[in-house]
């Protein structure tokens, strides 16, 4: 049958969608564009913000509009945390954030029987990591490897622990198998992803940590570049940096989750570190790596945030000098502790986000400018009208005038800043 899939949200969702696509293709089904007519649609939903909830509902309605007679199936965090609301949308099959193989079995049954099914477990009771086939999309150079699921940090603003459950880790032997498979398929870069990869190994009870996993991936992956997902500051210790520095394929791009640069706000968020510990991580990364790209997330207008507290955050992000930032006005998540706190007006949240974005853009342009004159091994991913486009190890996009470089790594000398990226010239080998 013909199946259209739409994915919202994080890299974990993208990874799980790719795993479903592989399995559907193996079962003989045809994947079609989501806007095309299909026998069934899958919406892999997100619930990290209210906007994510809204987009999830919109895509469910769009699927029903695209082909009124098609089976519409939804999975993911929005369905997991908003079961009754999702049921009201007239979805034929609802499953949450677990058991993708059974989800596809149920989808095939629903197409045959036209029976409505809702099968959503209690995420907080999960104890086993669901191993899915690793891989990437056809013609892609970069593959994702999901090594961890779940989170037990329970930040006061976040609904994800309720959507994903406790920490579960991909066993090291399974990780080795998947890395070898990706290497044999010709991928040039592997993105290590999970809901909270800093907690990798906590459930394995044998002392295994994220750096142990990275050393294994480097050993099994050969020349495949390793790119990390989001890290918590506690991960970045001197031992971590000393061992990571010895991995030649590890990209010097570190997304270090921050959320606020004010200690009082961090305490209300239950973030379990302060700005001093965060900055220690920033300094360690810069001590061990040559001008690494340190990126982060920021929430503006968190409940009870004063102008003075926000001013502390602005000063702190300037001190850190991030290469790039993801900035979000605070979004109320019903059922979280922050939802019961005194709320900051939305106009203030958005105004603070705009002010922070201006600082972030200035820092981003400064980081790009520091790249000019340097040479980087660039992994090229696509051809465009202006030439080939890829990413340097620090994840800055690089364009060269030459075409036909897809899935190759070329040394490129950076000659100029080009908007939000870089322009360069391939060096002779």
What are the language-model segments listed below?
Residues 47-48, 164-165, 204-207, 267-273, ...:
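Short glycine-enriched, charge-decorated loop/helix-capping segments at active-site entrances
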Residues 138-141, 151-152, 250, 260, ...:
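Short flexible coil/turn linkers enriched for glycine and charged/polar residues
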Residues 340-429:
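Terminal RNA-binding accessory module
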Residues 72-73, 81, 184-307, 318:
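Conserved SAM/AdoMet-binding glycine-rich loop
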Residues 1-200, 239, 250, 254, ...:
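Proteins enriched for Cys/Gly/acidic motifs involved in redox and nucleic-acid/cofactor modification
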Residues 7, 230, 258-260, 380, ...:
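Flexible glycine-/small-residue-rich
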Residues 175, 192, 228, 256, ...:
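Conserved, mostly hydrophobic/aromatic
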Residues 101, 153, 165, 198, ...:
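Glycine-centered loop/turn positions within well-structured domains
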